[in-house]
């Protein structure tokens, strides 16, 4: 199983989304689904598949003359790992601001909103008054932005 989900390129994410949706897919089906959307050559798509196999995100099974591909990492796990990796690079003081911007720019269902409200209410009970800045000492504007 792959460990560095953040190493998936934007193009590889497109391949993975199809694999996650279909469960199992062969290269011909991937090509047929991706070409109208992205206008990629067969060889480009096969290269992306090969990279995902090498990175450990796809498993290959031979069936006759065809190769079938299945994901080795569940979609939700890949998304959570990629998000966590991004947030590891942010200053602690800017994570809330980033989440707020993301929520503002995202279409959410009523169920999603209710779930977020419940999560935030639970977190509020134990949240610190202030989150510490973890930038270089005296070298950032975090404290000034408050």
UniProtKB/Swiss-Prot annotation:
Gene3D superfamilies: Winged helix-like DNA-binding domain superfamily/Winged helix DNA-binding domain. InterPro entries: BlaI_family, Cu_transp_CopY/TcrY, WH-like_DNA-bd_sf, WH_DNA-bd_sf. Transmembrane segments: none annotated. SUPFAM superfamilies: Winged helix' DNA-binding domain. The keyword Protein biosynthesis does not apply. GO terms for molecular function: DNA binding. Belongs to the BlaI transcriptional regulatory family. This is Uncharacterized 16.5 kDa protein in ptsI 3'region.
